[in-house]
Curated annotation (Swiss-Prot):
Entry protein name: ATP synthase subunit alpha
Organism of this sequence: Granulibacter bethesdensis (strain ATCC BAA-1260 / CGDNIH1)
SUPFAM superfamilies registered for this protein in UniProt: C-terminal domain of alpha and beta subunits of F1 ATP synthase, N-terminal domain of alpha and beta subunits of F1 ATP synthase, P-loop containing nucleoside triphosphate hydrolases
Organism ancestry: Bacteria, Pseudomonadati, Pseudomonadota, Alphaproteobacteria, Acetobacterales
Pfam families given in the database record: ATP-synt_ab, ATP-synt_ab_C, ATP-synt_ab_N
Enzyme Commission identifier(s): 7.1.2.2
Amino acid sequence: MDIRPAEISEILKSQIASFDSEANVAETGQVLSVGDGIARVYGLQNVMAGELVEFPSAGLKGMALNLENDNVGVVIFGDDRQIREGDTVARTREIVDVPVGRGLLGRVVDALGNPIDGKGPLTDVTRTRVEVKAPGIIPRKSVHEPMQTGLKSVDALIPIGRGQRELVIGDRQTGKTTVILDTFINQKPINQGTDESKKLYCIYVAVGQKRSTVAQIVRTLEEQGAMEYSIVVAATASDPAPMQFLAPYTGCAMGEFFRDNAMHAVIAYDDLSKQAVAYRQMSLLLRRPPGREAYPGDVFYLHSRLLERAAKMNDAHGAGSLTALPVIETQAGDVSAYIPTNVISITDGQIFLETELFFKGIRPAVNVGLSVSRVGSSAQIKAMKQVAGSIKLELAQYREMAAFAQFASDLDASTQKLLARGARLTELLKQPQFTPYPVELQVAVIFAGVKGYLDAIPTDKVVEFERRLVAELRGAQKDILDAIRNDREVKSETEAKLRSFLEGFVKNFTV
């Protein structure tokens, strides 16, 4: 073999010249045990709480939650069956972050912000941390702008303002999700306008629901033309508990993008009971001590830090807002259970839906007595305040009297009148699903009820009366609605017009 010294020296010189002194140092650990979506990892001495870690062999990510003396408890965002004992785990030195921005509108994503709707990769997005601190006291402003749901019983009696947190609570199958979908659909006319300060973007977070249910919700939003200004974040029942735990924070980060950029958004968490169950599962598997109903001690903080991020910002911070509509499912109407009482104490009011009312045909099945909005009439336009003030009182008196009237045989005329008016107002507050009313139409319809124009109509004909009234108002009497919408109050000349129209309409109404 012929050795050429010149050639060898050339090779050595070129290798020395291209030698890179920087070593690629990665802090890694090893999986000790894995199961139920939790991995115990040895090593990772400097890992941060809440840091994203990687399982390179499985192509999965996880989050370090328990930092103990001899190991780290990691929750896995994905199928833990792909991870084996002894696998390498690497630090990423990043806290969990997700994509945010306008590019998400019209899309369905998972709890990590990955698109799952088959419409290709996301565009026009930036990334932000999932867990951020809620705005302090100084950047906030009192809630004063209405967030119209399009439901008469909510907008008149339990008004919601932009930046408020209003709980939707009730047993299964009482129409909680329908209230939220109606609210989203009701924003369509506003969002078709050009005034960015009035638009309201919608985010729906599905936690622990069936995939078929989520698909049905997306289909409804698409059919109603509401998907173009909505984002759906889905962590379904088949997803691991860590994904169900993370999804509400992911949705909230997406909503905060609009809030912090002088825009308005509403986010619905459907539902937080399932998030609490997922968090309980994770905590017990991480060997954290259980508390009441086996929930961990920090389950209140789990929800409070999420809901405190909904806020109305002051003018110096862009005057944007994020409104939260958390949903809680009760068991047999028990609102005094642990999670319901927690969330009731965090939120600014609740819409309480009852099974009994639902089966009586009163839908939306809102229990007006137990439901409350702690923001109140400051979240209503003047026109609604003018007509809604008396309906609250009349319904309260009706409920009180109806309880006693069961035992009394002969009632005086004033009591009979009160009961008749209350029964008609209850009928008037009924509304079919996915038919939200604009606020000016609600005002006109409620005006007819509280001013006594329904008193001569049989109770079972009130719904038909309202249907015809709405058709007439939207047709020949459109100028009345336009006046209420533009003035944002019922002026004396508008009231006179409305009264004369209603008098003629009641006279001509034949069953």
